[in-house]
Amino acid sequence: MLYLIYQEDGDNATAIRAAKKEEHLAYLETHKDKLVLGGAALAEDGVARTGSILLLNVPSLADAEAFSQSEPFRMAGLFKLVKITRMRRGQWHPENAPKTAEGA
């Protein structure tokens, strides 16, 4: 089942992100069998980070919550809001995804 995890940054996010970045990336690599897509939520300027968005393929909401609660950024208190919602895959056109992280 697909679950979308939407996370909004809280206070001191820049410092927490810098301190926990390597742990965060290692955690995502360890769980890449569950991770469909992940990336930073950005302000309209395309530079300022406002949070993170993850799309997981896991058996249940409990599994999505466990993944989120064990993620190093969340454990460090980076996010002021975390919302997890189940979704159904509708249209799927991965060929339309940008070729770079910046969206080009």
Language model: regions and residue ranges:
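Conserved, structured core segments of small domains
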Residues: 1-104
